[in-house]
Amino acid sequence: MIVFKTPADNRTDYIKRLIGLPGDILQIIDGDLYLNNQKIQRNKIEIPININCGSEILKVNSFEEILPNGKKYIAVYNKEGSMQNTDKFIVPKEHYFFMGDNRDCSRDSRFLSSVGYVAFSNLVGKASLIFFSNDTKMGDFFKFWKWHKSIRLGRFFNKIQ
Protein backbone atom coordinates (compact mmCIF):
# COMPACT_ATOMS: atom_id res chain seq x y z
CA MET A 1 0.00 0.00 0.00
CA ILE A 2 1.40 3.32 -1.11
CA VAL A 3 0.51 6.92 -0.25
CA PHE A 4 0.49 9.27 -3.23
CA LYS A 5 -0.75 12.71 -4.24
CA THR A 6 -3.58 12.49 -6.77
CA PRO A 7 -2.52 13.78 -10.18
CA ALA A 8 -5.79 15.76 -10.47
CA ASP A 9 -4.89 18.30 -7.78
CA ASN A 10 -1.43 17.22 -6.58
CA ARG A 11 -2.60 17.80 -2.97
CA THR A 12 -4.99 15.04 -1.93
CA ASP A 13 -3.35 11.98 -0.37
CA TYR A 14 -4.64 8.58 -1.49
CA ILE A 15 -3.65 5.20 -0.08
CA LYS A 16 -3.99 2.43 -2.66
CA ARG A 17 -2.37 -0.86 -3.60
CA LEU A 18 0.40 -0.67 -6.20
CA ILE A 19 -0.65 -3.04 -8.99
CA GLY A 20 1.19 -1.93 -12.13
CA LEU A 21 4.74 -0.77 -12.83
CA PRO A 22 6.00 1.20 -15.85
CA GLY A 23 5.39 -0.83 -19.01
CA ASP A 24 2.84 -3.18 -17.43
CA ILE A 25 -0.45 -3.90 -19.18
CA LEU A 26 -3.55 -4.22 -17.00
CA GLN A 27 -7.13 -5.08 -17.87
CA ILE A 28 -10.27 -6.23 -16.10
CA ILE A 29 -12.32 -8.87 -17.92
CA ASP A 30 -15.58 -10.08 -16.34
CA GLY A 31 -14.36 -8.76 -12.99
CA ASP A 32 -11.03 -10.61 -13.15
CA LEU A 33 -7.79 -8.63 -13.04
CA TYR A 34 -5.17 -9.39 -15.70
CA LEU A 35 -1.57 -8.22 -15.37
CA ASN A 36 0.56 -8.52 -18.51
CA ASN A 37 -2.08 -10.81 -20.05
CA GLN A 38 -1.92 -13.18 -17.05
CA LYS A 39 -5.05 -13.63 -14.92
CA ILE A 40 -4.35 -12.81 -11.28
CA GLN A 41 -5.06 -15.80 -9.05
CA ARG A 42 -8.07 -15.14 -6.84
CA ASN A 43 -9.38 -17.41 -4.07
CA LYS A 44 -12.81 -16.69 -2.61
CA ILE A 45 -13.04 -16.27 1.14
CA GLU A 46 -16.30 -17.89 2.16
CA ILE A 47 -17.49 -15.28 4.65
CA PRO A 48 -19.16 -12.24 2.99
CA ILE A 49 -18.47 -8.88 4.61
CA ASN A 50 -20.29 -5.56 4.77
CA ILE A 51 -18.58 -2.49 3.32
CA ASN A 52 -19.38 1.18 2.94
CA CYS A 53 -19.90 2.28 -0.64
CA GLY A 54 -20.86 5.93 -0.76
CA SER A 55 -24.15 6.29 1.09
CA GLU A 56 -25.00 2.58 1.25
CA ILE A 57 -23.68 -0.50 2.99
CA LEU A 58 -23.21 -3.51 0.70
CA LYS A 59 -22.71 -7.20 1.46
CA VAL A 60 -19.79 -8.26 -0.73
CA ASN A 61 -17.53 -11.20 -1.38
CA SER A 62 -13.90 -11.03 -0.36
CA PHE A 63 -11.04 -12.70 -2.17
CA GLU A 64 -7.39 -13.36 -1.56
CA GLU A 65 -5.53 -12.19 -4.66
CA ILE A 66 -2.01 -13.32 -5.41
CA LEU A 67 0.17 -11.20 -7.68
CA PRO A 68 2.81 -12.84 -9.91
CA ASN A 69 5.51 -11.80 -7.40
CA GLY A 70 3.73 -13.84 -4.69
CA LYS A 71 2.31 -10.84 -2.82
CA LYS A 72 -1.06 -11.75 -1.25
CA TYR A 73 -3.81 -9.40 -0.12
CA ILE A 74 -7.57 -9.30 0.41
CA ALA A 75 -9.81 -7.47 -2.09
CA VAL A 76 -13.58 -7.13 -2.04
CA TYR A 77 -15.98 -7.16 -4.99
CA ASN A 78 -19.74 -7.00 -5.41
CA LYS A 79 -19.68 -7.81 -9.17
CA GLU A 80 -22.02 -4.91 -9.89
CA GLY A 81 -19.59 -2.05 -10.32
CA SER A 82 -19.05 -0.16 -13.56
CA MET A 83 -15.48 -1.39 -13.98
CA GLN A 84 -16.10 -5.13 -14.53
CA ASN A 85 -14.74 -4.87 -18.10
CA THR A 86 -12.15 -2.30 -19.12
CA ASP A 87 -9.92 -1.45 -22.01
CA LYS A 88 -6.24 -2.26 -21.58
CA PHE A 89 -4.24 0.12 -19.41
CA ILE A 90 -0.59 0.46 -20.47
CA VAL A 91 1.40 2.07 -17.68
CA PRO A 92 3.64 4.86 -19.05
CA LYS A 93 7.31 5.26 -18.26
CA GLU A 94 7.94 6.68 -14.75
CA HIS A 95 4.27 6.12 -13.79
CA TYR A 96 2.41 3.58 -11.66
CA PHE A 97 -1.04 1.99 -11.57
CA PHE A 98 -2.95 1.76 -8.29
CA MET A 99 -6.17 0.04 -7.27
CA GLY A 100 -8.15 0.15 -4.05
CA ASP A 101 -8.84 -3.14 -2.27
CA ASN A 102 -12.53 -2.20 -2.20
CA ARG A 103 -12.64 -2.64 -5.98
CA ASP A 104 -16.19 -1.59 -6.79
CA CYS A 105 -16.15 1.52 -4.58
CA SER A 106 -12.65 2.83 -5.19
CA ARG A 107 -11.59 5.87 -7.17
CA ASP A 108 -8.20 4.75 -8.49
CA SER A 109 -6.00 4.49 -11.60
CA ARG A 110 -8.84 2.91 -13.59
CA PHE A 111 -10.44 6.36 -13.66
CA LEU A 112 -8.06 8.19 -15.98
CA SER A 113 -9.74 11.60 -15.70
CA SER A 114 -9.62 11.79 -11.90
CA VAL A 115 -6.68 9.64 -10.79
CA GLY A 116 -5.18 7.74 -13.71
CA TYR A 117 -1.51 6.85 -13.90
CA VAL A 118 0.51 8.24 -11.00
CA ALA A 119 3.89 9.82 -11.71
CA PHE A 120 6.91 8.85 -9.64
CA SER A 121 7.07 12.46 -8.40
CA ASN A 122 3.60 12.05 -6.79
CA LEU A 123 4.64 9.11 -4.60
CA VAL A 124 4.80 9.98 -0.89
CA GLY A 125 5.72 6.69 0.77
CA LYS A 126 4.63 3.26 1.93
CA ALA A 127 1.62 2.92 4.23
CA SER A 128 2.50 0.49 7.00
CA LEU A 129 0.02 0.86 9.87
CA ILE A 130 -3.73 1.27 10.41
CA PHE A 131 -3.94 4.17 12.84
CA PHE A 132 -7.73 4.54 13.07
CA SER A 133 -10.62 2.46 11.74
CA ASN A 134 -14.37 2.90 11.96
CA ASP A 135 -17.38 1.48 10.17
CA THR A 136 -19.57 4.44 9.26
CA LYS A 137 -21.01 6.05 6.20
CA MET A 138 -18.77 8.88 4.99
CA GLY A 139 -21.38 11.49 5.95
CA ASP A 140 -21.35 10.22 9.54
CA PHE A 141 -17.57 10.32 9.85
CA PHE A 142 -17.60 13.89 11.15
CA LYS A 143 -20.19 13.05 13.83
CA PHE A 144 -17.54 12.00 16.32
CA TRP A 145 -20.13 11.52 19.06
CA LYS A 146 -21.34 8.42 17.14
CA TRP A 147 -17.87 6.85 16.83
CA HIS A 148 -18.23 4.72 19.98
CA LYS A 149 -20.72 2.57 18.06
CA SER A 150 -18.57 2.18 14.98
CA ILE A 151 -14.93 2.12 16.04
CA ARG A 152 -13.15 -1.09 15.05
CA LEU A 153 -10.64 -1.41 17.89
CA GLY A 154 -9.39 -4.75 16.56
CA ARG A 155 -7.90 -2.97 13.54
CA PHE A 156 -6.08 -0.17 15.41
CA PHE A 157 -2.31 -0.28 14.91
CA ASN A 158 -2.47 -3.40 12.73
CA LYS A 159 0.21 -3.74 10.10
CA ILE A 160 -1.03 -3.16 6.55
CA GLN A 161 -0.53 -6.14 4.24
Name the predicted role of every residue range.
Residues 1-161:
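Soluble "head" domains of membrane/secretory-pathway proteins
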